[in-house]
């Protein structure tokens, strides 16, 4: 939904990756099931924005003319509109082991380019006039895969193909869509500073810009302008908090580097000010076996990164991993804590306060996709009711 009273043209939504379903049929059905309830709670008198999650399979089907026509009719009937797409997970995202497979295919793979193009075609077809679009995507690759010889340049070259496609869409339709790389712990782009370095040291290299110039039939200066217009960063507040970033400062650093933030994901992580033996059982309840729960420990020697929660717990039992823990597990933003387990909600509140003061991004998306694996005590109502509660919490903080 559009939020009035904030700097810029700001839209708030939730991401439908919370709903299980990989086929286009499943996704359409989930919208019919959940959107009316959420809209009635948070946007009864105005259109409800939707952050649409598409799998690779669904994106390929959804862009077909008959599917698009039916989807437009469905959105009209629901009183909803789509302004952003989550094209991060390509395959199954619920009910199976996801872990590091969520990053595949990564930006070394032509399948990622096609998935992004399919998603862009869908978004361009349903994006309301006068509203920009965004597509969030994997942060290059899982860290070990991103540092193989030649990987960075290959990912950059494939990203240039995506930028050229988005530039062509704008030329053809007048609709601007930006692709947004989403930094995540233990990935090729993990921190804001790594993201800025990738733009400055890889994407802006003459040979990389030259490939975009050739693809888009522009000169080098035109290629850089297209790059900055159609490629930016999706800042996930949970991810930034897990990295112990000064979120407000890093969002400012992106702006000073000339890197856009097409989307901010409003989310919170688990925080333990000091890990203790007494907390092990409570922490283990979040070891769901489905998602990767990267854990970063801040101790006397600085930050130590663990790819998954079991790795951090094993280190703790071995006498290591002493200090503050932050765990990549999206927890409800309306909860200040989860009993004896803390939350990084204070980091989220600092970003929301920043947004009240000045423009940060046009697209704000609540993204607690873990409802199905959270301990039952934190599922306070129906899924639709909990989603609505998260949207309402963020909306209140943004306009108060």
Segments (PLM) and residue ranges:
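Aromatic-lined glycan-binding groove of carbohydrate-active enzymes
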Residues: 250-333
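Active-site acidic/histidine proton-transfer and metal-coordination neighborhood
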Residues: 2-3, 96-232, 242
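Active-site beta-loop-alpha junctions enriched in small/polar residues
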Residues: 17-19, 53-57, 87-90, 138-142, ...
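Catalytic core of soluble alpha/beta enzymes
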Residues: 198, 212-226, 237-250, 255-276
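Active-site glycine- and acidic-residue-rich loops that bind
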Residues: 59-61, 185-194, 238-250, 272-274, ...
């Amino acid at each position: 939904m559009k939020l009035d009273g904030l700097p810029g043209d700001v839209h708030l939504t939730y991401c439908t990756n919370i709903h299980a379903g990989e086929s286009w049929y499943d996704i359409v059905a989930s919208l019919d099931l959940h959107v009316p309830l959420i809209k009635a709670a948070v946007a009864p008198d105005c259109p409800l924005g939707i952050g649409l999650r598409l799998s690779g399979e669904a994106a390929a089907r959804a862009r077909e003319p008959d599917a698009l026509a039916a989807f437009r009719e469905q959105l009209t009937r629901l009183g909803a509109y789509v302004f952003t797409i989550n094209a991060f997970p390509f395959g199954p995202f619920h009910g199976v082991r996801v872990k590091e497979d969520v990053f595949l295919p990564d930006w070394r793979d032509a399948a990622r380019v096609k998935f992004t193009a399919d998603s862009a075609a869908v978004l361009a077809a349903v994006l309301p006039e006068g509203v920009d679009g965004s597509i969030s995507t994997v942060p290059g690759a899982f860290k070990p895969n991103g540092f193989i010889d030649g990987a960075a340049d290959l990912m950059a070259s494939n990203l240039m193909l995506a930028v050229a496609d988005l530039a062509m869409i704008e030329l053809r339709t007048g609709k601007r869509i930006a692709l947004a790389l989403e930094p995540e712990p233990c990935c090729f782009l993990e921190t804001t500073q790594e993201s800025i370095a990738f733009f400055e040291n890889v994407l802006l290299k003459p040979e990389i810009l030259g490939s975009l110039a050739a693809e888009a039939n522009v000169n080098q200066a035109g290629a850089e302008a297209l790059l900055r217009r159609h490629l930016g960063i999706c800042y996930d507040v949970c991810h930034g908090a897990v990295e112990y970033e000064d979120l407000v400062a890093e969002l400012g650093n992106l702006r000073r580097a000339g890197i856009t933030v097409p989307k901010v994901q409003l989310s919170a992580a688990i925080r333990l000010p000091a890990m203790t033996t007494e907390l092990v059982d409570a922490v283990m309840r979040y070891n769901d076996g489905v998602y990767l729960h990267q854990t970063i420990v801040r101790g006397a020697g600085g930050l130590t990164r663990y790819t998954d929660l079991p790795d951090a717990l094993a280190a703790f039992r071995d006498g290591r991993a002493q200090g503050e823990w932050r765990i990549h597990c999206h927890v409800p933003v309306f909860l200040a804590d989860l009993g004896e387990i803390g939350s990084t909600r204070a980091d989220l509140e600092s970003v929301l306060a920043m947004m009240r003061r000045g423009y940060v991004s046009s697209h704000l998306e609540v993204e607690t996709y873990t409802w199905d694996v959270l301990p039952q005590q934190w599922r306070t109502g129906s899924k639709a009711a909990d989603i609505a509660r998260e949207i309402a919490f963020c909306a209140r903080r943004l306009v108060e």
